Amino acid sequence: VAIFVVSRYVMDAENSYTRYEASKLASLVSAIRLPSSAFKSEAGTDVITDILVFKRHSSSTEYSINQSLGNLTYEAPYWVKDLSNIADENGNSVKFNSYFLDNKNIAGRLKVKSSQFGFTLDVAETAPLIEHLNRWTLTIPEFADVEYNPQETNANFEAIVAHLYIEMSGKQIGVIDRNEKGELYRI
């Protein structure tokens, strides 16, 4: 499990490359969008911040994803590409990640505000931040302990060593060669 505190642009950027790459490695377990004022006393500015909780994929899921990437059938989760619009009373709109609406994990009220760079998203504080965080943490699932399988780990290690040996020898899989005793074997 990994927890990141990031700018809203990780989740809201129209270019979804960062989210896409993250989705190949881990599942987004939970996330919360903090009010613009969450770090005002520390940073001296209003900035929308997200807390993202990821859990690394199991080896079987990772294998499945790699297979689908290889045959160009990988379908990223919706939080990678789904953006919603929010508009003010004058029709000025801003895009943001649909995940936060779908999961109701916004620690405040979304609105559009004018800035020196045009219109931008704002999250107005509606209650003390600690209340939002306490409610949110109760929604994060508990993770079961991962069972350690020494045979699987050893088999994976041996496969990696064999692959490295082949790569370092400069030989190709399927080639017939001689070992140290002069016996023929297939790589």
Residue ranges and their predicted role:
Residues 1-40, 47-54:
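Conserved Class I SAM-dependent methyltransferase catalytic core
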Residues 41-156, 160:
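Flexible, glycine-/basic-rich loop-and-beta segments that form/coincide
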Residues 3, 15, 26-29, 48, ...:
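Generic hydrophobic/packing signal
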Residues 8, 19, 24, 40, ...:
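Context-gated lysine
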Residues 14, 21-24, 67, 116, ...:
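Residue-identity detector for glutamine
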Residues 28, 73, 78-79, 100, ...:
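Generic preference for hydrophobic/aromatic residues in regular secondary structure cores
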Residues 143-187:
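Charged, often flexible domain-edge or linker segments that flank or initiate folded functional domains
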